[in-house]
Amino acid sequence: MKDVRALLLAAGLGTRLRPLTRSCPKCLITIGGRPLLEHWLCALYRNGITQALVNIHHHRTLVESFLARNQFQGWVYGVYEPQLLGTAGTLRQNREFFENEPVLLIHADNWCQCDFSEFLGFHSHQRPSGTSITMMTFRTSSPTACGIVEVDSKGVVQNFHEKIEDPPGNLANGAVYLLEPEVSAWIGERLFVKDFSTQVIPHFLGRIATWENQGIHRDIGMIHSLVAAQSDPQPVNCWDTADSWSRAFESHPVHHQLVGELD
């Protein structure tokens, strides 16, 4: 898929992972010895995404230091939010970066392994006509803790239920989306739109295609799910793990705390 640009939402506070996130942002929590954000950027790199924006808020200095590594220069850019803008607000604030191109919008605090080439290809060539968004979905064993979608025979979202007590199924929103430029334009024209799940998705019901991830998809917002992720098969790393940033991080008290908590 040509010209798609990525926005990785990585600025969250990670309150459910405290005390880990008191000294480390959630996006730098390690899985298989590598920061979560590095896993995401590796997936983009492998699939030819050459422009990516990462929003930053919590533990700004640590994230900016991570993004200053050589392998991210010229294609990954951090943007600091003194006050969090909301999942849709960040997209609106940075619309110029996307230059009227499709946007790969990623909630980068989840642990995801999938065939991104298939996801990108589905959006480009196979999504039903009349749709402007492709939502990655997955089957969850905890539907009350997820946003659950109802789809028609073509896989188009007809209804969406955000963390309700008795959801109608287990097909969950994976919080990874491909957006056509008209979606970004709609958000950009409406300053009151801050949240993607509660404001954008309801407006575009009937125009959201779905692609089901058959691989791994976890919300690692709780310690037990983060521990479970350590046992998942790990993808091959894209870059040298012995660079100066990695060596510094491994010697940092934050890293030792993470290792101690996850052992």
Roles of regions detected by a PLM:
Residues 123-133:
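Conserved donor NDP-sugar-binding/catalytic core segment of glycosyltransferases
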Residues 30, 137, 150, 178-180, ...:
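Short, well-ordered beta-strand micro-motif
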Residues 102-104, 111, 117-125, 141, ...:
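Catalytic-core segments of class I nucleotidyltransferases/pyrophosphorylases
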Residues 28, 149-151, 201, 210:
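A structural signal for short hydrophobic beta-strand segments in well-ordered beta-sheet cores
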Residues 19-22:
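Conserved catalytic-core motifs of eukaryotic protein kinase domains, centered on the activation segment
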Residues 134-148:
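Short beta-strand-to-loop element that shapes/binds the nucleotide-sugar donor at the catalytic cleft/hinge
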Residues 1-8, 16, 30, 34-118, ...:
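Conserved N-terminal catalytic core of the sugar/cofactor nucleotidyltransferase
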Residues 56, 80, 107, 135-137, ...:
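Short loop/edge segments at beta-strand edges and connector loops
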